[in-house]
Amino acid sequence: MQRLVLALIAVLIYQYSSSQEKLGRPFFTGDINFTLGINENYQIVPDDDNGPLIVPSALFFRVGFGYEFKKRIAVAFNSGYDLHWNYDIKAFPTYGSLKYNITEQDDSTHFIEVRYGKMWTPSSNYPDGNYYGIGLGIQAGGEDRLNTTFRIDFHRKGIVGFKNNRLDSVSFGFGFSFF
């Protein structure tokens, strides 16, 4: 009886692995995002020596790996490095993400992605905190298995010492996904 069950399971696994329609596919992803902020030293005066009103304020690097199901839903684990030079904050977020492709046309998709995880800070100035994010983006199909992504994201980092003990930012980014 055990041999029959094992043989049946082996046949089912073989059938599933050789079938035409696959459940999904693994992928590797990477992003670079930047955040713009208001220049706190900016003043409206005739001599404009205090710089522009809007200045870059942060840079985020992200890498991750995950699995896409039926070209509609993707689950991934990501890690990264965040640098907020205005506040001298360096952080390492690690988080899980859930991406849903809203539309798909000619290998290009529009998607929404939510993120939740932990943020680690190497400095003793700020304690570790939580990391949340939500974003919209476009993934453009490229050569073979490499796709380009463009995105806009809202990030919330739980950091004690800021207003409401959090640091919120909106970032613009581009990246890739390799299937």
Tell where the protein language model's regions lie, with residue ranges:
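Outer-membrane beta-barrel "beta-signal"
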Residues: N33-G37, L98, N165-F179
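A cross-taxonomic marker for long C-terminal extensions/tails that follow the last structured domain
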Residues: N147-K157, K163-S171, F176
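Gram-negative (and chloroplast) outer-membrane scaffold detector with strong preference
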Residues: I38, L59-G135, A140-L146
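Surface-exposed strand-loop-strand hairpins of Gram-negative outer-membrane beta-barrel proteins
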Residues: G37-F60
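Bacterial Sec-dependent N-terminal signal peptides
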Residues: M1-G24
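Transmembrane beta-strand segments of Gram-negative outer membrane beta-barrel proteins
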Residues: E21-E40
